[in-house]
C-alpha cells in the first residue's frame, strides 16, 4: 500500500496517480501474437464500419430510418473499439504498460458511454422494425427524420449520464493497495479491487444500473420482436416473410451477440470471479462484435449489398473516365 509518513511517525494512505495495465501476461512471443490478433481485429473493424458509414451516406436509396440507425451503430462501434484498441496495441509493444489516472478515467468514460449508447441504440432499432412491419401506414409519420434524430441523441444522452455516474463513483475512490490493473483496459471490476475504501455503493450501482439497462432494453427488443413475429405469421406472402426475416435476422443476430456478452460480463456475479474469463469476454464485445456487425448487416442485407455494388461501379467508372485521354488530344494534325 502506498503511504505518506508524517513527522509523528503515523502513516496515511496516498491515492495512486498512475496505473499499470497487466493485460494478458506472457513473454515477448505471446505479446507479439496478441498484437497481431488485436491489430487485425481493429483494422477490419475500422474498415468495415467506415465502409458502412460511407455507403449509407452516399447512396440515396439507403436514406431511410433503418439505415440512419445502422449508420449511427457503425459510428458507435468505430468509436467503441477505438477507445480500447489503440492503447492495448501500444501496451503490447511496451514494457512499462503505464496509464495515467486521468487517461484511465477518460478511457473508462468513453467506453461506458459508448457501450450504454449501443445498448439503447439496438433497442431503438428493434422499435423501428416494429413500427415498419406492424404499423406500415403510420411508419413514415412516426419515424420522421426529426424523431429519428431525437432517438439517437437520446441514446447518447442516456449513455453520457450513465457514464458520468459510473466514472464519478469509481474514480473518487482512493486507489492505494496496488496500481496494477488486471485487465487490458480500465474497467470497473478490476479497478474496484484496487480501492482501499468500501466499494459497496459502487458495486450496487454497477450491478443495479447495468442490470436495469440490460433488462429494460432486452424487454424492449423482445416485446418489439414478439409483435413482429405475430405479424409475420399473419402474412400470406412468402416473399414478404422472406424480406422481413432477412432484415430482422441481421438485427437479431447483432442483438444476441451484444446483449449475451454483456449479460455474461455484468449481470452474473460469478463471471467476475475470474478476471481471465472477463478479459476473453471483453475482447469479444470490444473488438469482435464491432468487427462482425458490418459483416452481419452487409452479407444478409440485399439493399446494402446492392449499394456496395453500385458504389464499386461508380468508383470504377470515375477511374475509367479519368484514365481516358481528352477527346482529340492524340489526333494527328
Curated annotation (Swiss-Prot):
In alphabetical order, the GO MF annotations are: G protein-coupled receptor activity; olfactory receptor activity
Where's it found, cell-wise?
A: Cell membrane
Q: What is its main location?
A: membrane
Tell me yes or no: is Disulfide bond among this UniProt entry's keywords: yes
Bilayer topology term: Multi-pass membrane protein
Provide the disulphide bond pattern.
104-196
Q: Which Pfam families match?
A: 7tm_4 (PF13853)
**Any one of the GO BP annotations:** G protein-coupled receptor signaling pathway
Q: Which residues are glycosylated?
A: 8
Q: Tell me the keywords, alphabetical order.
A: Cell membrane, Disulfide bond, G-protein coupled receptor, Glycoprotein, Membrane, Olfaction, Receptor, Sensory transduction, Transducer, Transmembrane, Transmembrane helix
Q: Which regions face the Extracellular side of the membrane?
A: 1-35, 94-106, 172-203, 273-278
Domain of life (superkingdom):
Eukaryota
What family does the entry list? Belongs to the G-protein coupled receptor 1 family.
What this chain does, per the entry, is described as: Odorant receptor.
Q: What is this protein called?
A: Olfactory receptor 9S13
Organism of this sequence? Mus musculus (Mouse)
